[in-house]
Amino acid sequence: MAVNVFTILQLAVFAAIVLNVNLHSVSADSKGTSDSQDSTKSIKVDFCETNCTKTDGGWTGCTGDCICVSVGDSIEGRCMDFG
């Protein structure tokens, strides 16, 4: 009787492992390219020749179609064109 219980437990563990591996492979296959990664919806970004700084009234230094982009709370940034 003890052998039968041990065999049943082994089969149950084996079935759980196979089921887990099967579910993992199915979910990994379902992760295709999302719409946000579609190359037809990408934007073109160019660096402009100037940098920019934050003053009391706002950001200054960018010309033309360039806008100032900064990181965090920095008072210095880089002018970029999102044409």
From Swiss-Prot:
Establish whether keyword Chaperone is in the entry: no
Which positions does UniProt annotate with glycan attachment? N51
Cellular localization per UniProt: Secreted
- Native species: Ixodes ricinus (Common tick)
Organism lineage? Eukaryota, Metazoa, Ecdysozoa, Arthropoda, Chelicerata
- Name the record gives this protein: Evasin P1124
Signal sequence: where?
1-28
**What's the domain of life for this entry?**
Eukaryota
Keywords attached to this Swiss-Prot or TrEMBL record, sorted alphabetically, are: Disulfide bond, Glycoprotein, Secreted, Signal
| Major subcellular location class | secreted
Name any one GO molecular function.
C-X-C chemokine binding
User: Which pairs of Cys residues are joined through disulfide bonds in the record?
Assistant: C48-C66, C52-C68, C62-C79
Q: Which GO terms describe its cellular component?
A: extracellular region
Function as written in the Swiss-Prot or TrEMBL entry: Salivary chemokine-binding protein which binds to host chemokines CXCL1, CXCL2, CXCL3, CXCL5, CXCL6, CXCL12 and CXCL13.
